[in-house]
Amino acid sequence: MNNQYPFQKLPLPYGFGALEPFIDTRTMMIHHDKHYGAYVDKLNAFLETCPDLQGLSLEELIINHSSIDEIRHNAGGVFNHQFFFENLRPGISQIVIGLSGKLLQTIQRDFGSMDKLREQFSTSANGVFGSGYTWLCAYSNGRLCIVSTPNQDTPLTLGLKPILCIDVWEHAYYLKHQNERVKYIQDFWHVVDWVKVSERLG
């Protein structure tokens, strides 16, 4: 991901309209250029005043310095947005290609089936109060779990390895889905990049 200060706003790995009709073009433009871009700018502005932190990676900042609000909110915002954008792909989700081998076996072992994973993940995402994210993560022993984090908190501070996330801040879906977060979550499953999720699991 984005390596160290000064952090750059990474381009989307697809066009703004590539996730239509599930996530609309205007939402992606505002989400990427305005919201994500603002976190990059605010993180760089803070780090400009902290030379001793400028050599740290995004992950190191989050894991070691999240007690600093400017790091927790802005480094978390950069990490979470990049992670979210990168686990989406245009067109119908590559569920057959990506869900094979180790990933499929691990999901079946820890959730029983893909349908049960989706059900539990969707329930958690819909249950986030206010703003935040829901994550599929791996423990150090390789077992999978679902966690939700408020605001721009990340699973990194919990010692977990994230492999999939959904952004449930209202700016991620409100222009298209209004107050129908459930419909947004349903649409999310159509654009998950399971190949990327499999790579993250390792």
Regions found by a protein language model. Name each.
Residues M1-G202:
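Feature for soluble, non-membrane regions of globular proteins
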